[in-house]
């Protein structure tokens, strides 16, 4: 026997195993009516309590939402909001918020934007992550057009995402006493440590003829510019919230919070909405009833199917593997 044939037979023998021939022991359960009913029953018993727990946690979150984009435009300028927001008029606006239930600290301050598509492909691609991490890559601005360079020098951070940084501001007072907003650690720690360099500083940012949003302090590294870090984590949906800061004191029921805000950010060009949100959190996060409702819905459907199949099984039992149900054993009149 030649060496070639010997090797061929050896390879064939080595591949002729229970694994390659798919002969390993396996569990192949048969979906009998009892197993189907039991599966739906267990699923319903598990999902419904989970839904109640999640919904209860969500309902425990206290949230105050105040839409201000329209109310902070003077009546005389509401016919042309874009011209007002792009003008030089004073954009200060006073708002009053009443706390309906006691809010334990920390109270999170968010800004909410609607009809704002941060997931647009051209918008998302208009950034340079390498430039954010290292000063060696500050000239890598090819993907940032049109906000890539100014007078032949690179813009740091470049791109439309950074250029459109949210620039409304909020100042809170209660009983004529200022409520400080803590803006430390509002961004992800992993972003601060790995995505934004400690030796990368803003350059030529918001210095062009068109100003998109907030300016950055050129003496503070990007790793400490937490408003920017929060903004650069783009949202997947057109309605989103981003963390503005934290109030590290309790807000009592009945408290009146006065807000002095600067209505600078232009959402009027695309019919967007702006809202100020004060919220507590639970072990599950912020207020979101969807998860609890989803669990309750799926659990209820599973219980309904379990009961329905049980009734059908008891009313019209059918022997498993009955050959009389085979097509060739049925009568010519349509069978059973």
From Swiss-Prot:
The keyword Membrane applies. Expressed in flowers. May be restricted to pollen grains. Keywords: Glycoprotein, Membrane, Transmembrane, Transmembrane helix. Pfam families: CDC50. Residues 127-142 have a biased composition (Basic and acidic residues). The keyword Transmembrane helix applies. The chain crosses the membrane at residues 36-56, 290-310. It is a multi-pass membrane protein. InterPro entries: CDC50/LEM3_fam. Residues 127-148 are annotated as: Disordered. It comes from the Eukaryota. Glycans are attached at residues 94, 167, 329. Its main location: membrane. PANTHER family: ALA-INTERACTING SUBUNIT 4-RELATED (PTHR10926:SF49), CELL CYCLE CONTROL PROTEIN 50 (PTHR10926). Belongs to the CDC50/LEM3 family. This is Putative ALA-interacting subunit 4.
């Amino acid at each position: 026997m030649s060496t070639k044939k010997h090797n061929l037979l050896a390879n064939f023998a080595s591949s002729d195993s229970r694994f390659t021939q798919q002969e390993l022991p396996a569990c192949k359960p048969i979906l009998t009516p009892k197993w189907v009913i039991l599966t739906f029953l267990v699923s319903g018993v598990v999902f419904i309590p989970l839904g109640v727990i999640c919904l209860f946690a969500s309902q425990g979150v206290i949230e105050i939402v105040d839409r201000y984009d329209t109310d902070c435009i003077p009546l005389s300028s509401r016919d042309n909001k874009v011209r007002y927001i792009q003008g030089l008029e004073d954009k200060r606006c006073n708002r009053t918020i009443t706390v309906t239930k006691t809010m334990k600290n920390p109270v999170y301050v968010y800004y909410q934007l609607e009809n704002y598509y941060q997931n647009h492909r051209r918008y998302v691609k208009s950034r340079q992550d390498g430039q954010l991490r290292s000063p060696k890559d500050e000239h890598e601005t090819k993907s940032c057009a049109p906000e890539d360079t100014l007078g032949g020098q690179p813009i740091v951070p470049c791109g439309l995402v950074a250029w459109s940084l949210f620039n409304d501001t909020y100042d809170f007072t209660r009983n004529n006493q200022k409520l400080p907003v803590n803006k430390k650690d509002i961004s992800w720690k992993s972003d601060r440590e790995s995505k934004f360099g400690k030796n990368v500083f803003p350059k030529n940012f918001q210095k062009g003829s068109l100003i998109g949003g907030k300016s950055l302090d050129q003496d503070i590294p990007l790793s400490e510019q937490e408003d920017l870090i929060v903004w650069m984590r783009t949202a997947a949906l057109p309605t989103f919230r981003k963390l503005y800061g934290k109030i590290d004191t309790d807000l009592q029921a009945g408290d009146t919070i006065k807000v002095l805000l600067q209505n600078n950010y232009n959402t009027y060009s695309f019919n967007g909405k702006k809202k100020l949100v004060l919220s507590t959190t639970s072990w599950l996060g912020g207020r979101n009833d969807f998860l609890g409702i989803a669990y309750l819905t799926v659990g209820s459907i599973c219980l309904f199917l379990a009961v329905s199949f049980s009734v059908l099984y008891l009313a019209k039992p059918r022997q498993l593997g009955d050959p009389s149900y085979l097509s060739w054993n049925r009568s010519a009149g349509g069978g059973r």
